């Protein structure tokens, strides 16, 4: 595998190097991640996540896996929906992000199971979860196809995968969006997080992520029987929903 190439932002790297490079980015941004999310999206990320939570139709006692759960925004929402009789796992491949998320939830009085987990090799049994979610994490994974197959594997029949991710913006807005992403975003990263390079990577990773229709097909190829998506904020983000029959 070491000889195969993949992208890290706009750069080309060996597949076995990407995970380490992505880890460096998120170790760097973890402490300022929530602040930067608010600044970068003008608070819209909260609206996108709220919409995602309302889409799930969870019931008390359900089991949920939050992949690349980061600072715990979705896990908090899922825990409120499934109640004490339910089960919500907060997972992330990055220890710094997972620590921030765990501590944040503990400070709010929420005790959830956490796992340092690779989405391409999930440490959970087949047909276990009612819902799997991944928000703003899929684009950083080296083998997205393998990760999607793992998400399918751990879902119960009738279970749902929700993928909230940056996507392809409507064409008339591309110029303004590029200016914001590549001129302003790294500057904000430098001023607020003292880290322009990491936010340059994040902007590049968004452009390299599959568009809405491509991701839909990838989910179908991974085994999902029904897939659709909903664009938000002119396509800046899309919520893909896959169902396992």
Curated annotation (Swiss-Prot):
It is an enzyme of class 2 (transferase). Methyltransferase required for the conversion of demethylmenaquinol (DMKH2) to menaquinol (MKH2) and the conversion of 2-polyprenyl-6-methoxy-1,4-benzoquinol (DDMQH2) to 2-polyprenyl-3-methyl-6-methoxy-1,4-benzoquinol (DMQH2). GO terms for biological process: aerobic respiration; menaquinone biosynthetic process; methylation. S-adenosyl-L-methionine binds at residues 71, 92, 118-119. PROSITE patterns: SAM_MT_UBIE (PS51608), UBIE_1 (PS01183), UBIE_2 (PS01184). SUPFAM superfamilies: S-adenosyl-L-methionine-dependent methyltransferases. It catalyses: a 2-demethylmenaquinol + S-adenosyl-L-methionine = a menaquinol + S-adenosyl-L-homocysteine + H(+); a 2-methoxy-6-(all-trans-polyprenyl)benzene-1,4-diol + S-adenosyl-L-methionine = a 5-methoxy-2-methyl-3-(all-trans-polyprenyl)benzene-1,4-diol + S-adenosyl-L-homocysteine + H(+). Transmembrane segments: none annotated. Pathway: Quinol/quinone metabolism; menaquinone biosynthesis; menaquinol from 1,4-dihydroxy-2-naphthoate: step 2/2; Cofactor biosynthesis; ubiquinone biosynthesis. It comes from Neisseria meningitidis serogroup C / serotype 2a (strain ATCC 700532 / DSM 15464 / FAM18). This is Ubiquinone/menaquinone biosynthesis C-methyltransferase UbiE. Belongs to the class I-like SAM-binding methyltransferase superfamily. MenG/UbiE family. Gene3D superfamilies: Vaccinia Virus protein VP39. GO terms for molecular function: 2-methoxy-6-polyprenyl-1,4-benzoquinol methyltransferase activity; demethylmenaquinone methyltransferase activity. Its EC number is 2.1.1.163, 2.1.1.201. Keywords: Menaquinone biosynthesis, Methyltransferase, S-adenosyl-L-methionine, Transferase, Ubiquinone biosynthesis.
